[in-house]
Amino acid sequence: MLDNPLIQQVLFEVMEEDVVGFDVLNVLIDSNEVTDDEISRQLEVKLNNIRRILYKLYEARLVDYNREKDEETNWYTYTWKPSLEKLPALVVKKMKNILDELKKQLSTEENGMFFYCMGCELKFTFEDAMDMGFRCPQCGGVLHEYDNKKDMATIKEQIAYIEDEFNQNPLFFKY
């Protein structure tokens, strides 16, 4: 399941782009139940970093924990376990949001006219370019009409990829 690119992208966002999170998830999946301290030792990563990742995963409801108090030391031990059954629904929700944004962006690209500063590599809508007198606000250079066919093709490819994943991957069928 974790080798799916859409799932990886969503997990990457959940873990705020911390790649160690994938290692943490793999340890959880392999062990089924493990303490944060054991994960820290196994991965040779600071305990605080492991806990931060676990809390992010917990907020997304992708892990659960049990808390036990050691009667001798009065310290709590947290045992973590994966709870990935909610992952497909989370992926679908996030990907639908991305899909909506891509479709809005495509509509803007299809219905708009754009201008481009070759020096600064900045793109502007016709309205913005007109307001600026067809001059770049950063370098003062002349703005040129921009052919956005490649941009539209890229957006269409991204939309098709996500829609294909939803339609062909059994992981997402019930959502």
UniProtKB/Swiss-Prot annotation:
PROSITE patterns per the UniProt record, alphabetical: HTH_TFE_IIE (PS51344)
* Matches recorded under InterPro entries: TF_E_archaea, TFE, TFIIE/TFIIEa_HTH, TFIIE_asu, TFIIEa/SarR/Rpc3_HTH_dom, WH-like_DNA-bd_sf, WH_DNA-bd_sf
GO aspect biological process, one term: transcription initiation at RNA polymerase II promoter
Q: Does the keyword DNA-binding apply?
A: yes
SMART domains from the UniProt entry: TFIIE
Q: Which keywords does UniProt give here? A: DNA-binding, Transcription, Transcription regulation
Q: Which Pfam families match?
A: TFIIE_alpha
Where in this chain does the record put each HTH TFE/IIEalpha-type domain? 3-88
Q: Which superkingdom, per the lineage?
A: Archaea
Listed GO molecular functions?
DNA binding
Task of the protein: Transcription factor that plays a role in the activation of archaeal genes transcribed by RNA polymerase. Facilitates transcription initiation by enhancing TATA-box recognition by TATA-box-binding protein (Tbp), and transcription factor B (Tfb) and RNA polymerase recruitment. Not absolutely required for transcription in vitro, but particularly important in cases where Tbp or Tfb function is not optimal. It dynamically alters the nucleic acid-binding properties of RNA polymerases by stabilizing the initiation complex and destabilizing elongation complexes.
Question: What is said about its interaction partners and assembly?
Answer: Monomer. Interaction with RNA polymerase subunits RpoF and RpoE is necessary for Tfe stimulatory transcription activity. Able to interact with Tbp and RNA polymerase in the absence of DNA promoter. Interacts both with the preinitiation and elongation complexes.
- Belongs to which family? Belongs to the TFE family.
Annotated domain remarks: The winged helix domain is involved in binding to DNA in the preinitiation complex.
In Swiss-Prot or TrEMBL terms, this protein is called: Transcription factor E
Name its species. Methanococcus vannielii (strain ATCC 35089 / DSM 1224 / JCM 13029 / OCM 148 / SB)
Source taxonomy lineage?
Answer: Archaea, Methanobacteriati, Methanobacteriota, Methanomada group, Methanococci
